From Swiss-Prot:
Disulfide bonds: C209-C217
Protein name: Beta-glucosidase 11
Record-listed E.C. numbers: 3.2.1.21
Pfam families given in the database record: Glyco_hydro_1
Record has Disulfide bond as a keyword: yes
Species, as recorded: Arabidopsis thaliana
Catalytic activity as recorded in UniProt: Hydrolysis of terminal, non-reducing beta-D-glucosyl residues with release of beta-D-glucose
Length: 521
């Protein structure tokens, strides 16, 4: 199925879409050499084959089968496990330069540790090789809401520091098996959202929470568990990053005596030559603005940035949590030992930014008074989404929010390299293939990235649209869509069809859009 084989049908609509975004004066050539454009998915949302070839359940399997995503689950999803060649061909036809996907930990290591599943290993080798054959960079996420259920059952998953050992061993396996072809690694997806949804509100795996903060809570403690989970995720991320730098990236042979280097260093040099990648972490962000110009609302907005972004990035840059968090959360916030602080500080090569929406922020300091506390009372704000936005509606088009986040990361954390790992527009799955709102959204946000890069000096390295195709969504199952490609979930073959946004993105990437140059505008 060649992507542009039905371009003639879409030409009038593409022209209409271009008219709608005619004020966005930029082209692919305005971005610097080395900047990559891609799209993304995650394992449970797209692979299917949930019970095939040795894969065992993850916490997302259990979550979905408990009915948390309605009646749907990811047992089949888009069946990329069997259709990866077709999907990579569609990516190549579209002109994608990179594909962000995640590895299913429980497909590769069915027990969470120990022996590798040969069929799982073969699948990811095949996918990576197919991408490279078509000139597409593989960008790999190691954990995307899908911890092996075996580890959750054994010791409580991310609530136990035992997870640091097992995650590091899992990362080591991935670096060893795929690192000769994969140069971009994200350890954990949306650390903050995973912790809040899974351990405070109970609306994402593993669905832990406590009243009155969560919904239908049967286990958990919303007051402390989110903070414990993030603490252990940061330690696990740091451990994996240090492992990569010490065993797969840093050349150690120079310090070895020549007498033992003859036999040993040859192997070492071969290994190190192939390992030249970078390791980062992913953070969900909101573009936050004060509801009023009052001092309290401005301070509240600063707290939102501290609690959502600083919760993750502050330890990685400065070795500790933000002072506002330590003050408001108190003893419920785990403390880094001196050794742990040294380990997490600097343990990243890039920051993965995820951004969809913007917030108005109002001070609510009175929420600090109750005896029962959780993240939402600790942050002490009232937040309202900008525009007519909810998980039920299309997102408001607020590209300034992404610009704001990129500027904040630059100014607060020393302008680290950044990849936009997710950004996209939601529509009902039943909506038309003529997704003009998605075209407008993507074109606006891509221009915002260019502005942040060329006018503000943010060190942005790439942009990944979410998602490549309609997938099994965490909120809404198959009823909500972010895809460039429509997937007919009622068709046994799960037919893929390019939407208008796919044609627009393809035209942009191939340089066939005729916007005036941003540099000359």
């Amino acid at each position: 199925m060649k992507l542009l084989s039905n371009s003639l049908m879409f030409l009038p609509l593409l022209a209409l879409a271009l008219t709608a975004v005619s004020s966005l004066k930029y082209s692919r050539n305005d971005f610097p050499p080395g900047f990559v454009f891609g799209s993304g998915t995650s394992a449970y949302q797209v692979e299917g084959a949930a019970d095939e070839d040795g894969r065992t359940p993850s916490i997302w399997d259990v979550f979905a089968h408990a009915g948390h995503s309605g009646v749907a689950a990811g047992n089949v999803a888009c069946d990329q496990y069997h259709k990866y060649k077709e999907d990579v061909k569609l990516m190549a036809d579209m002109g994608l330069e990179a594909y962000r996907f995640s590895i299913s930990w429980s497909r590769l290591l069915p027990s969470g540790r120990g022996p590798i599943n040969p069929k799982g290993l073969q699948y990811y080798n095949n996918l990576i090789d197919e991408l490279i054959t078509h000139g597409i960079q593989p960008h790999v996420t190691l954990h995307h809401f899908d911890l092996p259920q075996a580890l959750e059952d054994e010791y409580g998953g991310w609530l136990s520091q035992e997870i640091v050992r097992d995650f590091t061993a899992y990362a080591d396996t991935c670096f060893k098996e795929f690192g000769d072809r994969v140069s971009h690694w994200t350890t954990i997806n949306e650390v903050n959202v995973f912790a809040l949804g899974g351990y405070d509100q109970g609306i994402t795996p593993p669905a832990r929470c406590s009243p009155p903060f969560g919904l239908n809570c049967t286990k958990g403690n919303s007051s402390i568990e989110p903070y414990i989970a993030v603490h252990n995720m940061l330690l696990a991320h740091a451990s994996a990053t240090i492992l990569y730098k010490q065993q797969y990236k840093v050349l150690l042979s120079a310090s070895l005596p020549s007498s033992i280097c003859i036999a040993f260093c040859y192997v070492l040099f071969i290994t190190q030559y192939k390992q030249h990648g970078s390791v980062g972490i992913s953070v969900y962000t909101y573009g936050a603005v004060p509801l009023t110009n009052s001092v309290k609302d401005k301070q509240a907005t600063a707290r939102v940035n501290d609690f959502y972004i600083g919760w993750i990035l502050h330890p990685l840059v400065f070795g500790d949590y933000p002072e506002t968090m330590k003050t408001n959360v108190g003893s419920r916030l785990p403390a880094f030992t001196e050794e742990e602080s040294e380990q997490v500080k600097g343990a990243f090569d890039f920051v993965g930014v995820i951004n969809y929406m913007a917030l108005y922020v109002k001070d609510n300091s009175s929420s600090l008074k109750p005896n029962l506390q959780d993240f939402n009372t600790d942050i002490a704000v009232e937040m309202t989404l900008v525009g007519n936005t909810s998980i039920e509606n299309e997102y408001a088009n607020t590209p300034w929010s992404l610009q704001q986040i990129l500027l904040y990361v630059k100014e607060t954390y020393g302008n680290p390299p950044v990849y936009i790992l997710e950004n996209g527009q939601m529509t009902p799955h039943s909506s038309s293939l003529v997704d003009t709102t998605r075209v407008k959204y993507l074109s606006s946000y891509i221009k915002a990235v260019l502005h942040s890069l060329s006018r503000k000096g943010s060190d942005v390295k790439g942009y990944f649209q979410w998602s490549l195709m309609d997938v099994f969504e965490l909120f809404g199952g198959y009823e909500r869509s972010f895809g460039l490609l429509y997937v007919d979930f009622k068709d046994p073959s799960l037919k893929r069809s390019p939407k208008l946004s796919a044609h627009w993105y393809s035209s942009f990437l191939k340089g066939t859009l005729h916007h005036p140059s941003y540099a000359s505008s």
